């Protein structure tokens, strides 16, 4: 379980926790959305922090709401080292209740990329950049081309 391994926990310092912190993000944030989730973010020099809002309108059962939050926390835990600083608040939409865990995770990643918090992945099927040879790297015995 995560409690026994502190490296796998989601630290308190990486969470938006109080009503005042949520209010600051909602009042001063930029927004982007997806059919499953909505992201409110506020960039800053602070380490990245995540807040979640999953209401009973999304799923009336606590089990369903907790599943959505668990998937988002797990995705955030793996992204913390490469994520840009600031506060990120995810608001789940009712379609998230019927979505699978990978669909929720993919929607979260899409929103973070759209917000500029994550680097864009390399396009599949593209060639790697060509290695150029600098003239100083050629040995003296090799002829110049």
From Swiss-Prot:
Gene3D superfamilies from the entry?
A: 3.30.230.10
Task: Provide GO CC annotations from the record.
Answer: ribonuclease P complex
The yes or no answer to whether the keyword Cytoplasm is present is no
Stated name of the protein: Ribonuclease P protein component
A GO molecular-function annotation:
tRNA binding
Q: List the top taxonomic levels of the source.
A: Bacteria, Pseudomonadati, Pseudomonadota, Gammaproteobacteria, Lysobacterales
InterPro entries documented for this protein: Ribosomal_Su5_D2-typ_SF, Ribsml_uS5_D2-typ_fold_subgr, RNase_P, RNase_P_CS
The Low complexity compositionally biased stretches are 120-130
The region called Disordered is annotated at 120-145
- Gene name of this polypeptide: rnpA
The entry's function note states: RNaseP catalyzes the removal of the 5'-leader sequence from pre-tRNA to produce the mature 5'-terminus. It can also cleave other RNA substrates such as 4.5S RNA. The protein component plays an auxiliary but essential role in vivo by binding to the 5'-leader sequence and broadening the substrate specificity of the ribozyme.
